[in-house]
Regions:
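Transmembrane-helix bundle of Major Facilitator Superfamily
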Residues: 1-140
Length: 140
């Protein structure tokens, strides 16, 4: 059985989720003001904690797959991201939410380059690789 379509779909879904979380939190801001009593300053940190940690670590995290194995690195990234996501859903205050968003950013920084690295190693034929990267790029 050819597992490549399943692998590509999984990697595209991972990349989509990572990028969705950059903007998705903006929809929840009015609710955060009501439920957590968040100030404008705290709202800005809630939005930026994810993006800052993601941007700061994505280049360094890109080499983790080469060092420790791509599959293992992706799983670790997904676990970190998932733990941050679950903890964020249960955050009792804005400080906790900022911290969990930062944890999610760390996981995202691991996931994002690892998905592309896996694609380039699974799809070795030039045309096939170009299509796979194109689909991955479209999902982000």
């Amino acid at each position: 059985m050819n597992r490549r379509p399943v692998i590509l779909a999984t990697l595209c879904l991972c990349a989509f989720a990572v990028n969705l979380d950059v903007t998705l939190v903006n929809v929840t801001l009015p609710t955060l003001v009501v439920d957590l009593g968040a100030t404008t300053r705290e709202l800005q940190w809630i939005v930026d904690a994810y993006t800052l940690t993601f941007a700061a670590l994505v280049l360094a995290a890109g080499s983790l797959g080469d060092r420790f194995g791509r599959r293992r690195t992706l799983i670790v990234g997904l676990c970190v991201y998932g733990i941050g996501n679950a903890a964020g859903a249960l955050a009792p205050d804005t400080t906790s939410l900022v911290a969990t968003r930062a944890v999610m950013g760390i996981g995202a920084a691991i996931i994002f380059p690892t998905t592309l690295s896996i694609i380039t190693n699974v799809f070795t034929e030039r045309g096939e690789r170009a299509r796979a990267i194109g689909l991955w790029g479209a999902s982000t």
